[in-house]
């Protein structure tokens, strides 16, 4: 149940960030926190909001989420894992990105901890309009590949997910 709820939450956030894509023009090359703006505009499900916290939201699995515009080119959703939910969260994110691949330029997953093991995958997966023979395509990811990619991150690591709209 919680994983399905989490998937609905991320769908709402990611599609909401698409609606806010014009904000990136105002961001310049600065890291801008838009979590508060998305909360105030109704772009975040109410169960993800904790009173007294306006810079972060929480998903159904208890992961803390920061949403920002990191540059002119992409939104960044940083997920601080709450225990051993990271692999399941990663699988949800990649599965959702695969579904949204016609609208995405790229989904980039990476562990944020300096001591995080490197993955066998590039961890950059491209949407339908930007996918080439030499690039990893979101639409071509198999369930087994999604499992292998997410398992390569290990546990208890922060995961940075970059959603790039073009």
Regions found by a protein language model. Name each.
Residues 45-166:
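Intrinsically disordered, low-complexity regions enriched in Pro/Ser/Thr/Gly and acidic residues
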Residues 24-57:
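Extended amphipathic alpha-helical segments with heptad-repeat/coiled-coil character used for oligomerization
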């Amino acid at each position: 149940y919680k994983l399905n709820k989490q998937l609905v939450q991320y769908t709402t956030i990611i599609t909401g960030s698409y609606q806010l894509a014009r904000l990136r023009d105002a961001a310049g090359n600065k890291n801008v926190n838009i979590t508060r703006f998305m909360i105030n505009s109704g772009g975040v499900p109410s169960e993800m909001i904790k009173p007294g916290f306006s810079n972060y939201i929480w998903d159904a699995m208890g992961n803390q989420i920061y949403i920002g515009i990191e540059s002119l080119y992409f939104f960044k959703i940083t997920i601080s894992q709450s225990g051993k939910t990271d692999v399941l969260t990663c699988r949800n994110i990649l599965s959702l990105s695969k579904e949204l691949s016609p609208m995405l330029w790229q989904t980039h997953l990476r562990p944020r901890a300096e001591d995080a093991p490197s993955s066998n995958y590039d961890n950059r997966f491209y949407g339908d309009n930007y996918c080439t023979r030499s690039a990893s395509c979101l639409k071509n990811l198999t369930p087994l590949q999604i499992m292998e990619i997410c398992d390569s991150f290990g546990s208890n690591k922060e995961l940075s997910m970059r959603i790039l709209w073009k």
